[in-house]
């Protein structure tokens, strides 16, 4: 049987994708001398928030996710960010490949909410691998499964996430609301003659007694 191991070389924002995408550069090694014909790879990516420190401002921004900091000993737990998959071509010994991770700016998604709450530093990631490895030997092709015991850690710079979002949503964010709520907001904006959504939200904040930008 093959013995594979994975490491994350680096991460970067992908500027030419159809949707916001972070590209993880991975290295895979086969330690038993088998020639790998192909690798069908699945990857579960988890965020491990307990593996980093937070500033006072970050603690406030993450209150909705984790509660008061006195509760963080219980609430700061790893959570799923996303699932991705890819294929790796033939290699002997080792090779490097890109793993594209499509991202969302939807703040109803835990991963996006957490990442938006970070000002700087790193995002602690854990990659859990599964899939199928295809090898070729004297008796022909063989296929064997990968187990979830294969994993790799990576400290992705927060700057990578922010740089990626700036590429696709420059100086802006994105929220999801129900259609009835959006219709009501459109009427509010039209009745008051507000030319932009920013001005509509600023007007609502002022009416609620909150400071605007």
What are these model-derived regions, one by one?
Residues 60-69, 134-174:
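Short beta-strand elements
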Residues 1-23:
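Low-complexity, acidic Ser/Thr/Pro/Gly-rich terminal tails and inter-domain linkers that flank the onset
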Residues 15-28, 37-45, 101-105:
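Contiguous beta-strand segments within globular domains
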Residues 61-116:
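Extended, solvent-exposed segments with strong compositional bias
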Residues 179-196:
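Surface-exposed, Lys/Arg-rich phosphate-binding patches that contact polyanionic backbones
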Residues 42-48, 96-148:
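Internal, hydrophobic beta-strand segments that form the core of beta-sheet-rich folds
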Residues 195-213:
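Short, basic amphipathic alpha-helical segments that act as recognition/interaction helices
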Residues 46-57:
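Short aromatic-acidic-glycine turn motif
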């Amino acid at each position: 049987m093959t013995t594979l191991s994975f490491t994350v070389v680096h991460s970067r924002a992908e500027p030419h994708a159809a949707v916001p995408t972070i590209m993880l550069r991975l290295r895979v090694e086969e330690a038993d001398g088998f020639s790998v014909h192909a690798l069908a790879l699945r990857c579960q990516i988890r965020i491990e928030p307990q593996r980093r420190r937070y500033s006072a401002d970050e603690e406030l921004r993450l209150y909705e996710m984790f509660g008061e900091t006195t509760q963080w000993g219980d609430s700061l737990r790893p959570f799923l960010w996303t699932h991705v998959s890819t294929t790796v071509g033939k290699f002997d010994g080792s090779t490097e490949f890109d793993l594209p991770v499509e991202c969302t700016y939807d703040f109803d998604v835990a991963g996006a909410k957490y990442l938006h709450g970070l000002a700087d530093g790193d995002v602690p990631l854990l990659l859990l691998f599964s899939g199928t490895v295809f090898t070729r030997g004297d008796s022909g092709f063989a296929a064997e499964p990968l187990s979830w015991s294969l994993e790799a850690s990576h400290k992705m710079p927060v700057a990578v996430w922010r740089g990626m979002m700036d590429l696709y949503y420059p100086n802006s964010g994105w929220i999801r609301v129900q259609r009835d709520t959006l219709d009501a907001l459109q009427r509010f904006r039209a009745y008051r003659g507000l030319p932009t959504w920013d001005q509509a939200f600023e007007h609502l904040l002022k009416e609620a007694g909150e400071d605007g930008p």
